[in-house]
Amino acid sequence: MSIPNNLRYSEEHEWVKTEGNEVVIGITHFAQGELGDIVFVELPEVGATIEADEPFGSVESVKTVSELYAPVSGKVVAVNEELSDQPELVNESPYEGAWMVKVELSDASQVEKLLTAEKYAEMTNQD
């Protein structure tokens, strides 16, 4: 699967899509592939504050449990409730159906500090 050019990426394998003063966050195709079949997703409550580089949830796969690290700081304004009933969406559609949270940014400049698709591809040795 190609790496979408319209997103930014963290070194912890989260992606960020900017929508005005909000961002949508999920995990990358590379990350879900490394984790294997996802069986459970734990996400914060709407209204919670998340801090860049700090854990904000976790994903459990048949192999392991992995923390999700916030690529930006802000207030959670929406959570993808479908993932509680269908965690496998993370494997099936990491960039579309399996977004995890929407966050109102506290500092929009944090997005610009994230990796471009090209830099993320280099980091993960993907074409």
Curated annotation (Swiss-Prot):
The Lipoyl-binding domain, residue ranges: 22-104
Residues with PTM N6-lipoyllysine: K63
Cofactor stoichiometry and binding remark: Binds 1 lipoyl cofactor covalently.
Record InterPro entries: 2-oxoA_DH_lipoyl-BS (IPR003016), Biotin_lipoyl (IPR000089), GCV_H (IPR002930), GCV_H/Fam206 (IPR033753), GCV_H_sub (IPR017453), Single_hybrid_motif (IPR011053)
A GO biological process held by the record: glycine decarboxylation via glycine cleavage system
CDD domains: GCS_H
Keyword Cell division: no
Keyword Transmembrane helix part of the UniProt annotation: no
Gene3D superfamilies for the chain: 2.40.50.100
PROSITE patterns reported in the protein's UniProt record: BIOTINYL_LIPOYL, LIPOYL
Pfam family, one: GCV_H
Keywords: Lipoyl
Any single GO CC term annotated in Swiss-Prot or TrEMBL for this entry: cytosol
Cofactor(s) this protein requires: (R)-lipoate
Biological function: The glycine cleavage system catalyzes the degradation of glycine. The H protein shuttles the methylamine group of glycine from the P protein to the T protein. Is also involved in protein lipoylation via its role as an octanoyl/lipoyl carrier protein intermediate.
UniProt record similarity statement: Belongs to the GcvH family.
HAMAP family (UniProt xref): GcvH
Assembly and binders: The glycine cleavage system is composed of four proteins: P, T, L and H.
Protein name as catalogued: Glycine cleavage system H protein
Name of the coding gene: gcvH
